[in-house]
């Protein structure tokens, strides 16, 4: 007897390892086309830009390292057209839908869902259900080492490369900045706390995956997600993506850990 096919939504924070998971699921050809559908701002049609991540920061030594804002092109799609795009773009021919949602994107998702007809309720859980079509399997990816996560984020903000390896020249121009890393740590901790509070409030018990476990057991974890969404676990591929961190990232992590206590910065 065939099992029920279910959609899934990966819940995470930036640089937590979620891309490693969703790209491995995508590679199966049977687990949807998981994308970060809910990151695009209607005002620009773009994901948040470096300066938007540092909104409210007035430290010029940070701001001078960030690219200027791009005005983009406003997204004028109707709410129903937007929902249809999300549904069709995330689905493989077998009917499985996959996607990824960061905590900082939840307010925008709720705002866009509020304009849809025939709502099933209020709040984030109803918004997810009304956009996707039904309740997904929730998969929570998190990274216990938030300092390494923040360093990875800070490098990506400067190079503007969020997956794969950046251009060596631009990567060499990325600059260590303890204050910027601290700002990102606070942001990431707030986001992760948001997810955990929401799980408790809604009584949700997601598939919980820590990055170190994911990295060491990728094929087995992908198999477990496939099983949860009604697909053959044997389709889980061998590891694909390479680790983006390198010796320079490790040096920045060590330097920040050494400096943070003296500077009163979070770790």
Swiss-Prot record:
Disulfide bonds: none annotated. Homodimer. Catalyzes the sulfuryl group transfer from 3'-phosphoadenosine-5'-phosphosulfate (PAPS) to trehalose, leading to trehalose-2-sulfate (T2S). The sulfation of trehalose is the first step in the biosynthesis of sulfolipid-1 (SL-1), a major cell wall glycolipid and the most abundant sulfated metabolite found in Mycobacterium tuberculosis, that is a potential virulence factor thought to mediate host-pathogen interactions. Disruption phenotype: Loss of T2S and SL-1 formation. Unsulfated acylated precursors of SL-1 are not detected, which indicates that Stf0 acts before lipid addition to trehalose. It comes from Mycobacterium tuberculosis (strain ATCC 25618 / H37Rv). It is an enzyme of class 2 (transferase). InterPro entries: P-loop_NTPase, Stf0, Sulfotransferase_Stf0_dom. Pfam families: Sulphotransf. It catalyses: alpha,alpha-trehalose + 3'-phosphoadenylyl sulfate = 2-O-sulfo-alpha,alpha-trehalose + adenosine 3',5'-bisphosphate + H(+). Pathway: Glycolipid metabolism. The lineage of its organism: Bacteria, Bacillati, Actinomycetota, Actinomycetes, Mycobacteriales. Belongs to the Stf0 sulfotransferase family. This is Trehalose 2-sulfotransferase. The gene is stf0.
């Amino acid at each position: 007897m065939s099992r029920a096919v279910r959609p899934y939504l990966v819940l995470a924070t930036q640089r937590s390892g979620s891309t490693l998971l969703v790209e491995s699921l995508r590679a199966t050809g049977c687990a949807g086309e998981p994308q970060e559908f809910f990151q695009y701002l209607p005002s620009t049609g773009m994901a948040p830009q470096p300066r938007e991540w540092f909104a409210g920061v007035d430290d010029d030594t940070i701001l001078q390292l960030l690219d200027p804002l791009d005005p983009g092109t406003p997204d004028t799609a109707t709410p129903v057209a937007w929902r249809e795009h999300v549904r069709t773009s995330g689905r493989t021919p077998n009917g499985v839908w996959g996607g990824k949602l960061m905590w900082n994107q939840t307010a925008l998702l709720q705002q866009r869902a509020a304009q849809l007809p025939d709502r099933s309720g209020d709040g984030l859980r109803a918004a997810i259900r009304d956009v996707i079509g039904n309740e997904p399997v929730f998969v929570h990816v998190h990274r216990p080492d938030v300092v390494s996560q923040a360093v990875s984020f800070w490098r990506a903000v400067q190079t503007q490369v969020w997956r794969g390896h950046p251009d060596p020249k631009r990567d060499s121009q990325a600059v260590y900045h303890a204050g910027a890393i601290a700002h990102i740590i606070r942001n990431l901790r707030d986001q992760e706390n948001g997810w955990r509070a929401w799980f408790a409030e809604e009584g949700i018990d997601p598939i919980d995956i820590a990055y170190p476990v994911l990295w060491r057991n990728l094929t087995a974890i992908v198999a477990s997600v496939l099983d949860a969404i009604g697909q053959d676990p044997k389709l889980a591929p061998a590891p694909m993506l390479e680790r983006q961190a390198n010796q320079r990232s490790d040096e920045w992590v060590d330097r920040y850990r050494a400096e943070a206590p003296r500077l009163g910065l979070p770790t």
